């Protein structure tokens, strides 16, 4: 269905048959003088500039993007276009970019509605006016909760008191204009106040024009033409109406007066405007637009300077800290190559005036280290020798081939990225330090624009169109399922929808239009913007959803365009796990290590990695990584760098994985077309796996400069978003052919370069992550109890549930010891999981004994840490005499009592769960009685059945230390001739098998073309099941809903990798009864 068809015939095919009647006459309003084909006509048509236009950053109001609006304005021959989103400048940078492309001048502005109903637009005239608008938006947003604003006349008066306004105020009179509102605006802004005449082809246009002109004359205000634009073209009316319904949470049929009467709030042709407005009003709009000379691209920004001590410049102080770091990092002296790199980098930092930025990041890292918060830089900043010297990153330039141009380049306009990971449980301490250090006036988090995706869009659109909830769910599932090889129409028809139904067509049409349409602002994961002056002079600041957080209205792309620097303070769960593990090792095993001092290149650790015994470690814990480990067989640190990077969309799409593996296994010869190429690609056997290699390759083989190579890198990312790489293909081919390289090699390299457009890792980033991979693997191999305990205490994080972590620890492997795990018990447990028993490590010859893990009360569902701390505090004073004593001294309420009883945490005091429930019930019954009342005689209770106990374990603790559920079901599995996973070990490659297990993971990688990877677990271990897309579609319900899944398929064993190719799937969840098991799906 076309757009034109979509907005006709609405009444007859909509639930209830009641839709906005204006849609029925939309076709009649498409007059010839409003046709886009005649839009840009110069003869006899007045010029025009639109002064009141909302983009899609007026969330759920504006229907069109800045790109669409400026393209339409250009086509219509407008001289300027004001983007005036409601109490927001969130979309203004996109407006700037669209203005640059189209040549239509951007006017910066914002629309406001005061508490008393007064509506007006502020248009920025000059550099003095811009911070005034930013400040007013900030005042309004900070006075309300996230997503709202609150502004009164007193706020406006305070903003412009004692200052000369650098703005123009455009009064937007209501349906019944109130002269007092205009008079007040005139009082605040004087002759800078104008009256907007907005006509939309309604029956009373003539009368309204007369009223407004008379009012303007009465008040002595200049009247100007204005459009109250909500969309680029009239055809987007259906989208705008749908957004209105979504905003008001009403079906379209019930929106009534909330909807506009017609589709005239679009960018109309100048001919159409000439037929509606007197020439004087159009000319007044153009004249006002010409007075708005502010260019937002010229705003100035200064980084904080207070970190520079007296007597130093930023340059000299950064030099001093770098030299101190050099002495610490290289106590034996620095190599000539690294010294040269550092000097070159310091000179470039000074040239770009980034010294204060580096000093700020170093200060944040210093604070974290002083607070014993683990942190580590990542990303392209690991290419910086200066960052390594300052202690920000962990990648030693002597050990890894770095390329500074990937991080910092003289010709690159945007600032460098420095991303630092902090422990996820303690990152808030770091964020609040930044707020304290610079104040909330000068520090705020960047925004993230949350956009509609297919599933969220179709839910909102279908609800607006009145579809029943069950049909909305079915339709939404079509967007959350399937792959690019299955047409959307097929998925929708298979779900039972009739594509011939006009209503369904409209829903799908609007849904597609809303894909990637901004929905609201959220906070960036950790990108801080810090300024030497109040941030609200540069960009509006508003409240975040979280307490004690503020965000600016621009996202990271806007910041890059405006050349504002941000510090990324990110959260990483594995750092929390490692820090807690190291603390446990130090306190319980007597081994004092840091990440940097762990023994390197440890053979037993690499043997464990090669067996894919990596549950719970960093990065290489996913099923895809586990499948790669036995094939790649990492044996040294650089192998881990490759392992981290190779299981990514870029290398996969660029067909780099298999050639690398064949060469590594000696099944394919390695050759290089030149010594320069060999020098670059030899570490990865002739296959470019990293972005830095691509850049270096172009610099040596195609004579690219550092800046040109970096520009290609950025083009790769743009190509992923729909950009063009052909200009680079032609340039690369021409230059490489000129240096004698064969066409086949050039084509191969370029296809691999394009693969990086699907997401390729910088080597520096992979090396940073590989440090944590090795640390987590070493700890898992040599201190398995402490590692499992630390991992449990760092939850939630990673791929695996607490149950899987515990099962893995108890199971052990040929490469690591088994760990005993003890249940939660109020007599012994703390809030955290703890280590008990064992014997300290003395030496390699006397490694001691691994301790056991005592599960902590944090594992008990429904129990808070506050309650647990009260229990521990009371127990520390003296042991509990009985249940009543526990409840009295720990001040336990009924909820806490029940949670402990259900978790079996009272076994050390009263025995089994049934006895605990009875005892707790008795305590509750006796609460009103006086202390010292006689105790009832204990009643003997039969222990629950084993199956009941396991069910209760999973329900209350999320894991069980008893028999695995599959062990209880094993007799039934045998009756069905279903094998255990242990039975697969002796089966030859290609054998047909029938197995079943608990579903613990489902994954659908973007590069897998609809293939689903399922992890099954039984009492003996886990296996990976590969479900091809056609079977996934046919057995969709069993695949997605099963807790216990049976699989018939083909067992495969290749290069040490074992998996099951599914041929058929069956849901056996009924055998589990009410047992609910954790499964991490599609993370």
UniProtKB/Swiss-Prot annotation:
Pfam families: DNA_pol3_alpha, DNA_pol3_finger, HHH_6, PHP, tRNA_anti-codon. Keywords: Cytoplasm, DNA damage, DNA repair, DNA replication, DNA-directed DNA polymerase, Nucleotidyltransferase, Transferase. It catalyses: DNA(n) + a 2'-deoxyribonucleoside 5'-triphosphate = DNA(n+1) + diphosphate. One of its GO terms (cellular component) is cytoplasm. Its EC number is 2.7.7.7. DNA polymerase involved in damage-induced mutagenesis and translesion synthesis (TLS). It is not the major replicative DNA polymerase. GO terms for molecular function: 3'-5' exonuclease activity; DNA-directed DNA polymerase activity; nucleic acid binding. Disulfide bonds: none annotated. CDD domains: DnaE_OBF, PHP_PolIIIA_DnaE2. Its main location: cytoplasm. SUPFAM superfamilies: PHP domain-like. This is Error-prone DNA polymerase. It is an enzyme of class 2 (transferase). HAMAP family: DNApol_error_prone. The gene is dnaE2. It comes from Xanthomonas oryzae pv. oryzae (strain KACC10331 / KXO85). GO terms for biological process: DNA repair; DNA replication. It is found in: Cytoplasm. Belongs to the DNA polymerase type-C family. DnaE2 subfamily. The keyword DNA repair applies. The keyword Cytoplasm applies.
